[in-house]
Regions:
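N-terminal ligand-binding/catalytic initiation module
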Residues: 1-164
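Conserved active-site and cofactor/substrate-binding residues in soluble primary-metabolism enzymes
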Residues: 71-79, 115, 119, 123, ...
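A short glycine/serine-rich beta->alpha loop
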Residues: 162-170, 298-301
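Glycine-rich phosphate/diphosphate-binding loop of Rossmann-like nucleotide-binding domains
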Residues: 168-254
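Adenosine-phosphate binding glycine-rich loop
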Residues: 186, 274-325
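Alpha-helical segments flanking ligand/cofactor-binding loops in enzyme cores
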Residues: 214, 243, 265-268, 291-292
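Rossmann-fold NAD(P) dinucleotide-binding segment
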Residues: 245-249, 259-277
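Short, well-ordered coil/turn residues at beta-beta hairpins
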Residues: 255-256, 280
Length: 325
């Protein structure tokens, strides 16, 4: 997968065209962050591409579009860099041919329904076209299949890897990698793959978390607890909705929500008995100290570069069809 001269120029930091503004250089944290224009008030679009993409021109960036009401510009840029670096770890683990990248949309609106999604995706498409193959994207937090349809249309079905016009559902692919990681962990650590007597807490019941919870039930789990910011979403057949995932005992914590939720306080005060942390969330720990606390407590964490790799594996196949179309 090769990028073109335009993409290489941008990633190599020669003078950019007028479309992008560099807001962070790679010598700071190992990723370039570009700001792309958006024809919509209260919306800012950042693109973070890991250094490996311009260090190895045959590795274009890949990562989804995340939409959030960030507290500040710094929070949005930090998230973009962290997520791009995390995507590189996933791609490196499975040798997909991609490097890590992320599109992060900072919304000044707390209510995301105010956003003109088609206009936003048109702006994102302009940025992707300008990168000319240096970046491929798909769904992420608060973006959906309808958004991807807008993006496919605006890009001419280029640079979008979201399983559109196919039977592949990238959310199911991610959920499948979570389930596989859970079953592998249980078999390795408990002696067999029987999950019927284990208690699971699925934190976040969006597209991926809901699929994970339902699949755990289908595979024989009898104790699946579900928690979501929107209580209605946690009402999944044969599951038990809970109010506070961080205060409810379980054997398996399955993070499928926003990043950085496991803070030092959460890790230190999580109820006794937790054995494993395996989920879909990118960067579930707020910092290294939070992860270290879980480690000291004997909680086994399966890195998300393994447990949530389903979508990037699907992307690595889909990109061949996109490039040939």
């Amino acid at each position: 997968m090769k990028t073109t001269a335009t993409a290489n120029t941008i990633l190599g930091f020669a003078p950019l065209n007028d479309l992008f503004k560099i807001v962070e250089h790679p010598n700071e944290r190992g990723a370039i962050v570009l700001e792309a224009p958006v024809d919509q008030a209260g919306i800012t679009l950042y693109i973070a591409i890991d250094s490996d993409s311009y260090g190895h021109i045959e590795r274009p960036g890949n990562g989804g579009i995340r939409l959030l009401n960030y507290e500040s510009t710094k929070h949005a840029i930090d998230d973009a860099v962290r997520l791009a670096k995390g995507m590189t770890r996933k791609h490196d683990m499975f040798r997909t041919g991609f490097s890590g990248a992320k599109l992060v949309v900072k919304s000044d609106h707390k209510d995301l329904s105010f956003i003109d999604r088609k206009s936003l995706m048109t702006s994102a498409a302009s940025a992707l076209r300008a990168l000319e193959g240096g970046m491929y994207t798909g769904c992420d937090l608060n973006t959906c299949d309808i958004d991807m349809d807008y993006l496919v249309e605006a890009t001419g079905n280029r640079f979008v890897l979201a399983g559109r016009n196919s039977r592949v559902d990238t959310n199911v692919a991610t959920a499948s990698s979570v389930i596989g990681s859970i079953l592998g962990t249980v078999e390795a650590m408990e002696g067999d793959a029987d999950i019927s007597q284990l208690t699971f807490t699925v934190q976040g019941c969006g597209k991926v978390g809901t699929t994970v919870a339902k699949e755990l039930i289908r595979l024989g789990a009898k104790h699946v607890q579900t928690c979501d910011l929107y209580p209605e979403c946690a009402k999944i057949p044969k599951c038990t909705p809970i109010k506070d995932w961080a205060l409810t005992p379980c054997d398996f914590l399955v993070p499928c929500a926003n990043s950085l939720a496991i803070t030092e306080e959460v890790a230190a005060n999580f109820p006794e008995g937790i054995k494993y942390c395996v989920g879909a969330t990118n960067s579930p720990f707020a910092n290294e100290n939070a992860m270290s606390i879980f480690n000291r407590r004997g909680v086994m964490h399966i890195p998300e570069s393994i447990s949530s790799a389903g979508a990037i594996l699907a992307d690595s196949v889909e990109v061949r069809y996109v490039m040939l179309s």
